Amino acid sequence: MTEHKETIFIVDQVTPKPGQAKAFLDTYMARYAPAARERGMTLVHQWVSPPMWLDDQSNTLTIIWTVKGAPAWWAMSHQGRRNPEVAGFWDSIKPMIVSRHRSFSSEVADLESLADV
């Protein structure tokens, strides 16, 4: 069995409405994070910019998860798409959000082995 050591980073960047960043993050951690962990994702960072909770403006939250190797990424992605609770979470929290974006990244040194699936 091949051991997959490459780290794939799942980066959620969310801009909640003014004054809503802390409430959004609390809800994300309570409702989204447990299911993400069940799908094999490991939480590595929760960043807030600027580094204070704003009341009259929007913060930007960057939440970074990881999985090990392409098979874990595909499994996580497949499970998330088939779970109506994931879509339901994002639909329910939409009123708190100005924008959100998810991206996936890896180390350049891992690209060749990640592409060898």
Regions inferred by a protein language model and the residue ranges of each:
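Basic/polar N-terminal segments that are highly enriched at the extreme N-terminus
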Residues: 1-5, 116-117
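An amphipathic, aromatic/His-enriched active-site/gating alpha helix that lines ligand/cofactor pockets
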Residues: 2-4, 26-45, 56-57, 66-105
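Active-site-flanking beta-strand signature of metal-NTP-handling nucleotidyl enzymes
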Residues: 8-14, 62
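Short amphipathic
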Residues: 11-13, 103-107
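Short, surface-exposed ligand-recognition loops at beta-strand->loop->(often short) alpha-helix junctions
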Residues: 16-24
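Short, solvent-exposed loop/turn elements at beta->coil junctions and helix N-caps
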Residues: 47-53
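Acidic/histidine-enriched, glycine/proline-rich intrinsically disordered or flexible terminal extensions
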Residues: 105-117
